[in-house]
Amino acid sequence: MPEILDQARTQVLENGVGLDEAGALAVLNLPDEHLPAALQLAHEVRMRWCGPEVEVEGIVSLKTGGCPEDCHFCSQSGLFTSPVRAVWLDIPSLVEAAKQTAKTGATEFCIVAAVRGPDDRLMRQLREGVAAIRAEVDIHVAASVGMLTQEQVDELVEMGVHRYNHNLETCRSYFPNVVTTHSWEERWETLRMVRASGMEVCCGGILGLGETVEQRAEFAAQLAELDPHEVPLNFLNPRPGTPLGDRPVVEGKDALRAIAAFRLAMPRTILRYAGGREITLGDLGTRSGLLGGINAVIVGNYLTTLGRPATTDLELLDDLKMPVKALSATL
């Protein structure tokens, strides 16, 4: 058994203290023959500190495309030649999407907008949409609408948004290679205000942007410092017309190493499968991740890419004897 896994068994599994950056790097560098043991330990940590339930979430785009930022992985940027163009979703369609999400047993419904940060129009639409969903659908409403001012944070709290997603995307040292129109620190400031407001913080990123293994460990440590309620893990699904459109996808075993490392760095955090798992891991790898530290999934499609049918994921959870977290358990 590698020394890092012996250390993690005592430090993380028994005492609930996450691995630091050096520990995460050691897990990320484990040879293939020790990957099953790392995943097994990560699963034991998840079961010990989070329990057996899996949180299910659906997401929908209130405003798609036309974003002024240059996030190099994103086809919604108005600066690239990708085919996504600006379009708004009407409120009845937003409510219907929430209803369909709730039918899957999901407890979370996240409203997303492709913006640097919300303007007055978006805040009005968001207020109307959140109110309509809360009146008609038994589901928690989350939001992801970019960088916020303190006034906007306060408005979201007043609306009843209980969780806010704002991904750091990658580690601080690599971020300037991925985004140049705003800084990592600006994102961190929004997250600081969200945490202070009492809303739950959802913050993760994308693996496979060109970062090194060392930078993945750096990212895990920075997320652990933030201590978010939830960490969504995406794997790059290269989008035509974007600067990263020709990047290779993450190797499945490297993705699983990352899942184990992030779980061992953050034993109590909701670790959610997000975009890209379909092409990076496939069916078998998706199962392995759920048995290796993952305890939440986004069901259905993502913002600009196709996901798996909700029934496929729900059948897998049933096969693994992993109960879907009930709404009453999240209140």
Swiss-Prot record:
Pathway(s) per entry: Cofactor biosynthesis; biotin biosynthesis; biotin from 7,8-diaminononanoate: step 2/2
Job description of the protein: Catalyzes the conversion of dethiobiotin (DTB) to biotin by the insertion of a sulfur atom into dethiobiotin via a radical-based mechanism.
First-level EC class: transferase
Residues holding [4Fe-4S] cluster: 67, 71, 74
Family the UniProt entry places it in: Belongs to the radical SAM superfamily. Biotin synthase family.
Keyword Iron-sulfur attributed: yes
Catalytic activity, EC: 2.8.1.6
The organism's place on the tree of life at top rank: Bacteria
Matching SUPFAM superfamilies: Radical SAM enzymes
Full protein name: Biotin synthase
Positions in coiled-coil regions: none
Cofactor annotation remark: Binds 1 [4Fe-4S] cluster. The cluster is coordinated with 3 cysteines and an exchangeable S-adenosyl-L-methionine.
Domain annotation Radical SAM core: ranges: 52-277
Required cofactor(s): [4Fe-4S] cluster; [2Fe-2S] cluster
